[in-house]
Amino acid sequence: MEMDKRIKSLAMTAFFGELNTLDIMALIMSIFKRHPNNTIFSVDKDGQFMIDFEYDNYKASQYLDLTLTPISGDECKTHASSIAEQLACADIIKEDISEYIKTTPRLKRFIKKYRNRSDTRISRDTEKLKIALAKGIDYEYIKDAC
């Protein structure tokens, strides 16, 4: 399965800065009934720990335009508490995905927009995003415009 353009467009416009990789995993599970093939322990450019989820030919971080670097086994010790916390969150999400979506307002809003926004509107938002990024306009401005 390919990366979903509708999720990517909404994540980068209306929901920019609101989602993380756990949210993307939850959305994919809810919308497509797909579980990740692999879990990757990573850090972002600031050294903050984050779990990334690998699917057939894409990762959850790609929906958010995040560049994550996988950590080595030795580095796992440094991030042990974050690993435990995020794995526990992932397990809670997987246990009852529909309840998790219902109790998380931003994901509930995302699902509603995903299901109710027309392909034309999402395509238009994606075009605005491409044009704005080419001109060097900030994501926050784009989010407000969409």
From Swiss-Prot:
Induction record: Expressed in the late phase of the viral replicative cycle.
Transmembrane segments: 10-32
Annotated S-S bridges: none
Signal peptide segment: none
Protein's UniProt keywords contain Nucleotide-binding: no
Cited InterPro entries: Poxvirus_H7
Membrane topology: Single-pass membrane protein
Superkingdom of source: Viruses
Pfam families (UniProt xref): Pox_H7
Protein location: Host membrane; Host cytoplasm
Record's GO cellular component terms: host cell cytoplasm; host cell membrane; membrane
Protein name per the record: Late protein OPG112
Source species of the chain: Vaccinia virus (strain Copenhagen) (VACV)
